[in-house]
From Swiss-Prot:
PANTHER family: PTERIN-4-ALPHA-CARBINOLAMINE DEHYDRATASE
Enzyme Commission number: 4.2.1.96
Protein name: Putative pterin-4-alpha-carbinolamine dehydratase
Top EC class, one word: lyase
Record InterPro entries: PCD_sf (IPR036428), Pterin_deHydtase (IPR001533)
Biological processes per GO annotation: tetrahydrobiopterin biosynthetic process
Annotated source species: Rhodopseudomonas palustris (strain TIE-1)
Keywords: Lyase
Matching Gene3D superfamilies: Transcriptional coactivator/pterin dehydratase
Translocase among keywords: no
Family of this protein: Belongs to the pterin-4-alpha-carbinolamine dehydratase family.
Catalytic activity: (4aS,6R)-4a-hydroxy-L-erythro-5,6,7,8-tetrahydrobiopterin = (6R)-L-erythro-6,7-dihydrobiopterin + H2O
Length: 100
């Protein structure tokens, strides 16, 4: 899978509100806020199932009601269409889980 060009990344990010291109590396990132830890953990559980099915896994961390996510395709050395697809799936799951 090929890395997205700078213009392709920018076009993808326009369709992904809340996602940012990370300056320190070839990746995109986002933070999700939930009402409480249970909602945050429920979101992570649902994403884990989708990520496993897609065989593409996020880098993430959870502190109480916040989930910080970084997406990149290590084999390609940057952001690919797989990251964009997973970001869209995560946004849909987050909405169903009550993210703010």
């Amino acid at each position: 899978m090929n890395r997205l060009s700078a213009s392709e990344r920018q076009a993808a990010l326009r369709e992904l509100p809340g996602w940012l291109e990370l300056e320190e590396r070839e990746a995109i990132g986002r933070s999700y806020q939930f009402t409480d830890f249970s909602e945050a953990f429920g979101f992570m559980t649902r994403v884990a199932l989708a990520a496993e099915k897609a065989d593409h896994h996020p880098e993430w961390r959870n502190v109480y009601r916040t989930v910080d996510v970084v997406l990149t395709t290590h084999d390609a050395g940057g952001v690919t269409e797989r990251d964009v697809k997973l970001a869209k799936a995560m946004d849909a799951i987050a909405e169903r889980c009550g993210a703010r």
